[in-house]
């Protein structure tokens, strides 16, 4: 965190992205509190944003993701020259993961319009999708196997129950 603190000390502006309260910055929260002289802005899509520490905010709950809001800023305020394949990929990953690969939190065509523009910017959508949704760590596979082993099938209801205790989740 020392490197982060050095960057923050030299910042002209701190941008908080994708959370509704500064306390959600975790370990950095205390460090960030020491920089009350640096203006802060919030860009977010969650409900009940705590705006008390920000000089400005863009908080739209009927937007798929904060990444979509960032894309709108980039595309609508003259920053498209900075939208290279790396930045476009990061924005697309944010939209994909916040929407469960476009299965929820879509409030209209805008999300798809933005993603279309991102993909046309040399973004390798199949590769990104594969890395996010088809690549599993050993721990994730072991957890899946453990869960499937604990599954109780209720044939008469065409349903199944998988449950984990808090202790099991922390293993």
Predicted features and spans:
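Short glycine-rich anion-binding loops that position phosphate/pyrophosphate groups of nucleotides
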Residues: 19-22, 46-48, 166-168
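Structural motif
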Residues: 15-16, 41, 159-163
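A short helix->loop->beta-strand "cap" motif at the edges of active sites that frequently abuts
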Residues: 35-40
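Hydrophobic helix-and-loop "lid/oligomerization" segment in the mid-to-C-terminal part
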Residues: 1, 10, 96-171
């Amino acid at each position: 965190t020392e490197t982060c603190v050095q960057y923050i000390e030299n910042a002209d502006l701190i941008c908080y992205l994708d959370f509704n309260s500064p306390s959600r910055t975790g370990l950095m929260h205390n460090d960030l509190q020491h920089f009350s002289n640096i203006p802060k802005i919030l860009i977010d899509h969650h409900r009940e944003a705590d705006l008390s520490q920000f000089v400005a905010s863009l908080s739209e709950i009927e937007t798929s993701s904060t990444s979509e809001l960032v894309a709108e800023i980039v595309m609508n305020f003259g920053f498209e020259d900075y939208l290279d394949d790396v930045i476009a990929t990061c924005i697309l990953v944010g939209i994909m993961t916040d929407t469960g690969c476009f299965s929820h939190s879509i409030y209209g065509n805008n999300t798809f319009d933005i993603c279309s523009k991102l993909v046309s910017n040399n973004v390798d959508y199949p590769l990104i999708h594969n890395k996010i949704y088809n690549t599993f760590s050993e721990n994730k596979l072991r957890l899946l196997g453990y869960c499937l082993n604990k599954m109780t099938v209720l044939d008469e209801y065409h349903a199944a129950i998988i449950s984990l205790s808090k202790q099991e989740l922390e293993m």
